[in-house]
Design a protein with these regions (language model features):
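Residues at beta-strand starts and edge strands
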Residues: 66, 135-137, 217-219, 289, ...
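Short gly/ser/thr-rich secondary-structure transition/capping motifs
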Residues: 61-62, 121-124, 274-276
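Charged, cofactor-coupling segments
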Residues: 1, 5-29, 177, 186, ...
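Glycine-enriched loop-and-adjacent helix/strand subsegments that border the catalytic/binding cleft
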Residues: 75-246, 252, 282, 309-310
Length: 310
């Protein structure tokens, strides 16, 4: 199932997307939550109600008539991990640094701004953000049930589904503040984009590769800037799985339905890495540029960079 959040007549609603049409799930069955967070909190019962409603009902809304927003518009938290070895090793090598051995010891993550989540469409920035503005091609897992001290062997059961994530980054701000060995902060917290929908795990079964370390999915990942492909990798190349990341995240801490965890940038998944490897020539995102991230099974997330009003 492809779950979405959308705006219609000023209201935010929960829906399911299918072939360009939208099911208004709450309208089909009043027992289904009318927003994504409550839907996820309802767990398997809500999912089964939604599946039954879609079987009995029909989509009544054209996707062209509504505004898609972040599938989880008000997440309790957003964490971003650092799970792809190629990206980490290449980015360090480009700065004349050896691969950091601690990468193989623990899956690391940071918190970003859970009040600055965007979906499809315009992405507003201020002038200082445009100083080496970068995209980051990532996949995000959405937590489907609460837990604490979760083992790797159990962690995949806590994932409701996946969506595309663009962790946009202002590199000049980021590099300045991280010299202080704390962060990232202003280089990241102005926003990330997610979407276009939250895909439940059952739709991704054909791509799944299970192991003792947790599930991986053989999904091609691509990034396009102004319709020109600049990046490509595969989701299954994650060195650390989401299951391992969740074990680390949940140690001594509760996680909640709707929490978002990003994979971190995939190999070649940003201009910082591409420019350093001389694949691109000092290319960054500019005002008016369109960036599209595409992952097999998860769709395409497209954003246009615009100047924030005021």
């Amino acid at each position: 199932m492809k779950l979405i959040s959308y705006k219609q007549n000023g209201n935010i609603k929960l829906g399911a997307f299918e072939e360009g049409k939208i099911y208004d799930l709450h309208a089909l069955d009043g027992h289904i939550a009318d927003n994504m967070l409550e839907f996820l909190q309802g767990g398997e019962e809500q999912l089964q109600l939604a599946m039954a409603a879609m079987e009995d009902g029909s989509p009544t809304i054209s996707a062209e008539d509504v505004e898609l927003i972040s599938p989880v518009p008000n997440p309790p938290s957003v964490r971003d991990a650092y799970a792809f070895r190629q990206h980490v090793a290449t980015a360090r090598r480009n700065r004349g640094l050896e691969m950091i051995p601690e990468f193989d010891e623990i899956p690391i993550f940071y918190f970003t701004n859970h009040h600055a989540v965007f979906g499809e469409g315009y992405f507003p920035v201020l002038s200082r953000h445009t100083e080496k503005l970068d995209f980051e091609l990532e996949c995000a897992a959405v937590i489907g049930k609460g837990g604490r001290n979760i083992s790797t062997s159990d962690a995949d059961d806590y994932i409701a589904g996946f969506m595309i994530m663009n962790d946009l980054s202002a590199r000049v701000l980021q590099m300045q503040e991280m010299k202080l060995n704390l962060g990232p902060a202003k280089g990241k917290d102005f926003g990330s984009t997610f979407g276009p929908w939250l895909v439940t795990k059952d739709e991704l079964e054909p791509y799944k590769k299970s192991s003792a370390d947790g599930d991986r999915y053989d999904l091609k990942m691509k990034a396009f800037v102004n319709d020109i492909q600049v990046s490509g990798d595969t989701f299954s190349n994650m060195t650390w799985t989401f299951a391992q990341i969740i074990e680390r995240v949940s140690y001594g801490v509760d996680i909640f339905p709707g929490d978002i965890i990003g994979s971190g940038t995939c190999g070649t998944g940003c201009f910082l890495e591409l420019n350093g490897s001389k694949i691109t020539d000092n290319q960054w995102l500019n005002l008016g540029d369109t960036v599209s991230l595409e992952i097999d099974g998860l769709g395409t997330l497209t954003n246009k960079i615009v100047l924030e009003n005021g």
